[in-house]
Amino acid sequence: MESPMTSTLHRTPLATAGLALVVALGGCGGGGGDSRETPPYVPKATTVDATTPAPAAEPLTIASPMFADGAPIPVQFSCKGANVAPPLTWSSPAGAAELALVVDDPDAVGGLYVHWIVTGIAPGSGSTADGQTPAGGHSVPNSGGRQGYFGPCPPAGTGTHHYRFTLYHLPVALQLPPGATGVQAAQAIAQAASGQARLVGTFEG
């Protein structure tokens, strides 16, 4: 007959082995949950709505309601008529200190002839009526030494002349060379400009 102590000693290794098995199973099974590894977190991609693009910058433009680009200039705006400036409309992008307007004739008999120069035009959009100078602008003497507009007046028999109405975008306030007029002033404006837009009208000589 075994003594109580002997029976206890025989059972102790079995109990210890059983406890170790429970601990091992608990460590492997994670409490009975899914033993697969959790995949790494991947943030969702952020997309930009392609249907709402940023607003486009306003372009530099010049036009006239009295004649289209490349079309004849009405006689009322020439020396054969009232000799007043045609109405104009224009727009410019942001960033200009001022705008400038130069009207010239590259087909003049004696070479390039500047008919009108206006500097200091307020940036942005604007318009003029017949005979008006753009807002904020002041005239620089043209090739004939005259301040203000002088319309098409080509000699007879000289063919088609092209009158260029060029609007310049000036990023800083214009400083013309002292005494600059006509072609010299027009060249200084073109060199200082960061952009230009042009309207061309024709007139027969």
Curated annotation (Swiss-Prot):
SUPFAM superfamilies attached to this UniProt entry: PEBP-like (SSF49777)
Stretches the record annotates as Disordered: 126-145
Keyword set, alphabetical order: Cell membrane, Lipoprotein, Membrane, Palmitate, Signal
Predominant cellular place of this UniProt entry's protein: membrane
Chain coiled-coil ranges: none
InterPro entries, A to Z: PEBP, PEBP-like_sf, YbhB_YbcL/LppC-like
Cellular compartments per GO CC: plasma membrane
Residues with a covalently attached lipid (N-palmitoyl cysteine): 28
Gene3D superfamilies according to UniProt: PEBP-like
Signal peptide: 1-27
Topological category with respect to the lipid bilayer: Lipid-anchor
Name of one Pfam family that matches: PBP
Lipid-anchored residues (S-diacylglycerol cysteine): 28
Subcellular location, record wording: Cell membrane
Family of this protein: Belongs to the UPF0098 family.
Protein name: Putative lipoprotein LppC
Protein's gene: lppC
